[in-house]
């Protein structure tokens, strides 16, 4: 059973889907390396993992076949001056219409570029304002912290000065009392 399944898998790898379907209808084996059409023959030269190569053989034309037909171009009718003038006016109208369309597209493109530039400028201005506001706020906070630190230092110095004055007074009192 396993051998049959392996053989079936190998056959499936070798056959194309079209060959597989055809083998259901035509059980006799066919040469899958040669395909013939009305006026050409295709031979498979080699089959590799990287791709396939084919040889295309064109059959010579048979003497029975009809002579090649040449398509006759429609006869040009003589154009009157009015028809020529109408065609020229229509062409001029098309040219002007195309020019107007190109100008409209350019105007739309410039408008879009202007809008994008305006938006970028607004965003830049907003960013600058926000950065400036943050900087001012930070500077104010630093100033307040500095003033608070200075006030604390001054308070400590005054406290030390008061303590030193009290120590001196106590020493003087001690000297007076003992002396």
Swiss-Prot record:
Q: Which UniProt keywords apply?
A: Cell projection, Coiled coil, Cytoplasm, Endosome, Golgi apparatus, Lipoprotein, Membrane, Palmitate, Phosphoprotein, Ubl conjugation
- What family does the Swiss-Prot or TrEMBL record give for this protein? Belongs to the stathmin family.
What does the UniProt PTM comment say about this protein?
A: Sumoylated. Phosphorylated by MAPK9 and MAPK10 in the developing brain cortex. Phosphorylated mostly by MAPK8.
Localization per Swiss-Prot or TrEMBL: Cytoplasm; Cytoplasm, Perinuclear region; Cell projection, Growth cone; Cell projection, Axon
GO molecular function: any one?
calcium-dependent protein binding
Q: Where is the lipid attached (S-palmitoyl cysteine)?
A: 22, 24
Q: Which organism is it from?
A: Rattus norvegicus (Rat)
Q: Which residues form the SLD domain?
A: 38-179
* Subunit text: Interacts with ITM2C. Interacts with MAPK8. Interacts with KIFBP. Interacts (via the N-terminal region) with CIB1 (via C-terminal region); the interaction is direct, occurs in a calcium-dependent manner and attenuates the neurite outgrowth inhibition of STMN2.
Q: Name one Pfam family in it.
A: Stathmin
GO process annotations (BP): cellular response to nerve growth factor stimulus; microtubule depolymerization; negative regulation of microtubule depolymerization; negative regulation of microtubule polymerization; negative regulation of neuron projection development; neuron projection development; positive regulation of microtubule depolymerization; positive regulation of neuron projection development
- Identify the stretch(es) annotated as Regulatory/phosphorylation domain: 39-96
Key word Lipoprotein present in the record? yes
SUPFAM superfamilies assigned to the protein according to its UniProt record, in alphabetical order: Stathmin
- Give the consequence of mutating residue 62 to D: Increased microtubule stability but no effect on neurite length
Q: What is the effect of changing residue 73 to A?
A: Partial loss of phosphorylation. Complete loss of phosphorylation by MAPK8, increased microtubule solubility, and reduced neurite length
Membrane topology classification: Peripheral membrane protein
Tissue specificity here reads: Expressed in neurons (at protein level). Present in growth cones and abundant in developing neurons.
**What is the name attached to this protein's record?**
Stathmin-2
| Function summary | Regulator of microtubule stability. When phosphorylated by MAPK8, stabilizes microtubules and consequently controls neurite length in cortical neurons. In the developing brain, negatively regulates the rate of exit from multipolar stage and retards radial migration from the ventricular zone.
List where this protein forms a coiled coil. 75-179
Per UniProt, what is the name of the gene that codes for the protein in this document? Stmn2
Q: Which GO terms describe its cellular component?
A: cytoplasm; endosome; Golgi apparatus; growth cone; lamellipodium; membrane; neuron projection; neuronal cell body
Q: Where is this region: Membrane attachment?
A: 1-26
Sites of the modification Phosphoserine? 16, 50, 62, 73, 80, 97
